Amino acid sequence: ITDKKVLNAILNIPRHFFMDIDFQSFAYDDKAFPILSNQTISQPYTVALQTELLKIKSGDKILEIGTGSAYQTSILIYLKAEVYTIERIFNLHKKSKKILSMLSFQPKKIVWGDGYLGLPEFGPFDKILVTAGASEIPKNLLKQLKFGGKMVIPIGNKSQEMTVIERIEKEKFKKYKYGKFNFVPMLKNKI
């Protein structure tokens, strides 16, 4: 990770606020930990890499798929992005809203819903960040990406390849791969 703004965000966002009390003493270890509903908070390296791959500029309109603990959401907001975030698990959605409010991080929109559908009513987006492993590239999300926009998405079943998809034209995309990772699965029609 070489982006100083990303490193600064990771250093300045208190990760322990986003974790279950049982794991707070380990909050600054570079590991993923369980949160509610069999989900996880990603390890700091993964959060930093995904954020760096987005190449965020102040004011970028970003769609985040999988609010989860809201740690990644906070990093994006800290970097002055306009964040629209969606979470399929209601308990996580409620908890993340509370934590974001407590820390005074306000996304443009925080929604309980199906991430596979995205938020077309608020698109198109400069960037899309998917924080769960997708078995395939969701076509609905590609449609919500601006021309010249980037989507960072882990693709695969048991393990995933971190992938950046750049929209070149209406139906033309470029893909770049950045190594293997393990994420909780991105599920369709499951809210």
Question: What are the roles of these predicted feature ranges?
Answer:
Residues 1-63, 67, 71-79, 92-106, ...:
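Class I SAM-dependent transferase core
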Residues 55-174:
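Conserved nucleotide-cofactor-binding alpha/beta core module
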